[in-house]
Curated annotation (Swiss-Prot):
Residues 200-288 form the GAT domain. The gene is TOM1L1. The lineage of its organism: Eukaryota, Metazoa, Chordata, Craniata, Vertebrata. Residues 442-445 are annotated as: Interaction with PIK3R1. Interacts with FYN, GRB2 and PIK3R1 when phosphorylated. Interacts with LYN. Probable adapter protein involved in signaling pathways. Interacts with the SH2 and SH3 domains of various signaling proteins when it is phosphorylated. May promote FYN activation, possibly by disrupting intramolecular SH3-dependent interactions. This is TOM1-like protein 1.
């Protein structure tokens, strides 16, 4: 089984393996040919920039070997100058600059002064930008943070050469006049160049920085006095103007931090920029809270309007008003109908009774208008039982109900008996032909309101035979 390096090892890639060999401590001096070969691989492969940066991180991370660190810095310098934006954009990230290069400045690594100055020079030069639109905001942030901590950056070789030329020119031709101090907006030099301010320029710069400080104090006071949702209109207008001016001044301060060489001026610029940035962040937070409160008020207003309006038109709602009452006949109409029906021995109920009655199940039949009608006991009991049931006023008029007609029955006292009568035999005396009178029967109508059939069945019970038998016994 062959043992090899893991794919997670940065040295396992082709470019990583070359970087490991070129920066090994056993190498006597920089192999520039090998360095150029590494640059070619970075430029010609898709994963070359990423793999190269990973290998460089591993070489300088927690490395106490000064020889390997020096060789690695030389390789980094050559790759930055000869590789494209894909490599440059990775090398200027905070992850590489702050987590690897800046940590080498820790005293525990005990780096020589020339190596420390080389690292600081890298950070300062990269913060000034690259051609091709490479984002250097992260390395610039690291640079400003180091300046704020009081780290002194050495002048670059170009700056040292320019300073020597200016010194020689001043010594040969002393100036006859003092240049006018430019404003803050004019103390901006082109990229990859620095500016050495004269005392007049420094004084002018301090006066403009004082104006920026005053604007910051005014912005802070307005933000403290106003509350989102109940702010003063005039204060908000002034705050917007100060915010716009502060944004412009912040951009100029950032440009000055890159080109100005005076350490005292740089420290003051950093402090003013920090105060201005806090004021700008406070204004943006105030604006967000203001927008949120406006949206909440708008939503509450819409919710109030929604609850105050009916959810549906009134014509679509259920009509719970009482139903219209049935038309009633007047007293004159009742008298006229009584006169017309007098010949039929019918009479209409009085107006008082009519007013207290509900509409009957079948309005076309007025059962209460019958007079002198003999109602059998069975029908009376049935009517008493039915009165306790519910009356359905809305029963359909075209129902196929069969109405029971009252039947006149003879009232004959019968002997009380608790048992049902047995059927008469065929040879019973009451069934003989000599009997002249036919037997009398009670006609009992059996009515079941829940039965599905529409016909009724009559049950006949012979009573006369019982009576004849009793009379015959008495005669004997």
């Amino acid at each position: 089984m062959a043992f090899g390096k893991s794919h997670r090892d940065p040295y396992a890639t082709s470019v990583g393996h070359l970087i490991e060999k070129a920066t090994f401590a056993g190498v006597q001096t920089e192999d520039w040919g090998q360095f150029m070969h590494i640059c070619d691989i970075i430029n010609t492969t898709q994963d070359g920039p990423k793999d190269a940066v990973k290998a460089l991180k591993k070489r300088i991370s927690k490395n106490y070997n000064h020889k390997e660190i020096q060789l690695t810095l030389s390789l980094i310098d050559m790759c930055v100058q000869n590789c494209g934006p894909s490599f440059q954009s990775l090398i200027v990230k905070k992850e590489f600059v702050k987590e690897n290069l800046v940590k080498l400045l820790n005293p525990r690594y005990n780096l020589p002064l020339d190596i420390q100055n080389r690292i600081l020079n890298f950070i300062k030069t990269w913060s000034q930008g690259f051609p091709g639109g490479v984002d250097v905001s992260e390395v610039k942030e690291v640079y400003l943070d180091l300046v704020k901590k009081g780290v002194q950056f050495p002048p670059s070789e170009a700056e040292a050469e320019t300073a020597r030329q200016e010194t020689a020119q001043i010594s040969s031709n002393p100036p006859t006049s003092v240049p006018t101090a430019p404003a803050l907006s004019s103390v901006i030099a082109p990229k990859n160049s620095t500016v050495t301010l004269v005392p007049e320029q420094i004084g002018k710069l301090h006066s403009e920085l004082d104006m920026v400080k005053m604007n910051v104090r005014v912005m802070s006071a307005i933000l403290m006095e106003n509350t989102p949702g109940s702010e003063n209109h005039e204060d908000i207008e002034l705050l917007q103007k100060l915010y716009k001016t502060g944004r412009e001044m912040q951009e100029r301060i950032m440009d000055l931090l890159v080109v100005v060489e005076n350490e005292d001026v740089t420290v003051e610029l950093i402090q003013v920029n920090e105060d201005l940035n806090n004021a700008i962040l406070g204004y943006e937070r105030f604006t967000r809270n203001q927008q949120r409160i406006l949206e909440q008020n708008k939503n509450q207003k819409e919710a109030t309007n929604t609850t105050s309006e009916p959810s549906a038109p009134s014509q679509d709602l259920l009509d719970l008003s009482p139903s219209p009452r049935m038309p009633r006949a007047t007293l004159g109409e009742l008298n006229t109908m009584n006169n017309q029906l007098s010949g039929l021995n019918f009479s209409l109920p009085s107006s008082d009774v009519t007013n207290n009655l509900k509409p009957s199940l079948h309005p076309q039949m007025n059962l209460l208008a019958l007079e002198n009608t003999e109602i059998p006991p069975f029908a009376q009991r049935t009517s008493q039982n039915l009165t306790s049931s519910h009356a359905y006023d809305n029963f359909l008029e075209h129902s196929n109900s069969v109405f029971l007609q009252p039947v006149s029955l003879q009232t004959i006292a019968a002997a009380p008996s608790n048992q049902s009568l047995p059927p008469l035999p065929s040879n019973h005396p009451a069934m003989t032909k000599s009997d002249l009178q036919p037997p009398n029967y009670y006609e009992v109508m059996e009515f079941d309101p829940l039965a599905p059939a529409v016909t009724t069945e009559a049950i006949y019970e012979e009573i006369d035979a019982h009576q004849h038998k009793g009379a015959q016994n008495d005669g004997d």
